[in-house]
Amino acid sequence: MTETRPGPKPRISILVPTPLLITEITEPAAHRNRSSHESDVLMHPGGQGLWVARMAGSLGADVSVSGPFGGELGSLIRTMLDGLGMQVNAVRYGYGNGGYVYDLRGEDRETVAHMPPPELSRHELDDLYGTAFVDALASDVLTVTGAEPGDVVPASFFGRLIRDTRDAGTTVVADLSGKPALAAVAANVDVLKISHEEVLDLELVAEDTAEALVSAGHMLLERGAGAVVISRAKDPALLVEKDSVREVSAPSITPLAHRGAADSMTAGISVGLARGFDLVEAVALGASAGALNVARRGLGTGNRTTIEKFAREITVRTLS
């Protein structure tokens, strides 16, 4: 892997269509016997885009996020992001942000409450587009993440932003699924990161064998993507380019959590490209970030030095 040299921080601009407030109820770190309901209550900024942003920051990037913020939850999320040192390009959100409350005291994560955010209005979409586009022009890489629920932002929005940003000369990495993923491909996104489950949802192939997924990757290249990275949970990821197919694998790690690897991988790819790595090196950095994130408590968290050292242990094997 290319060694990181001292110099200006790589700048990553991240589109975050649905910033969320995540509240978790856990067993108390220390029992003080002060209440029959004694528990720890933790609050975090969350959602796909903010988890990508946290990992990009952990990897030493100068991170800015563009998204809608409003209502009581929006104010809390912005304050938390300020504390993490992120630049927040906030668009006014009339109805306000959504969030989750999870109970982690049992063996499985239990959803206690879910407040889904409403779709953005026409004027809010216009403001978000302009804010994200202008910020991307001052960045090394624009990373585009999806909305949850999907109807908050229309698929055409992603395609327009990606096309215009690429035409202006900024590299674009997209971590999208469904119609937004296809819109990104049609807009000639530089790198599409997508999971094997999401590939199946596109109905390009009927099974998730490596051969079928590679075939789907080539279909996405034919439709306009520059490269496709397919994550496969515990199995090696696939990097599909026009003239090559590579398998990217990490040493086995016992996970503490099964969520967060894909978002961390996207962050690593984005930071690698922003540093000037070639795509194979960037994907190796992403694979390292993703593998180590599941060995930690906290989505999108990681240690830069550890991730960069572990990236040397990532195996990249050429399949064709």
Regions found by a protein language model. Name each.
Residues I12, A61-V63, V88, V172, ...:
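Hydrophobic anchor at the start of a short beta-strand
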Residues R54, G99-D103, P236-L239:
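Short beta-strand scaffold segments in enzyme catalytic cores
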Residues S156-V172, L176-D243:
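Conserved phosphate/ATP/ADP-binding segment of small-molecule kinases
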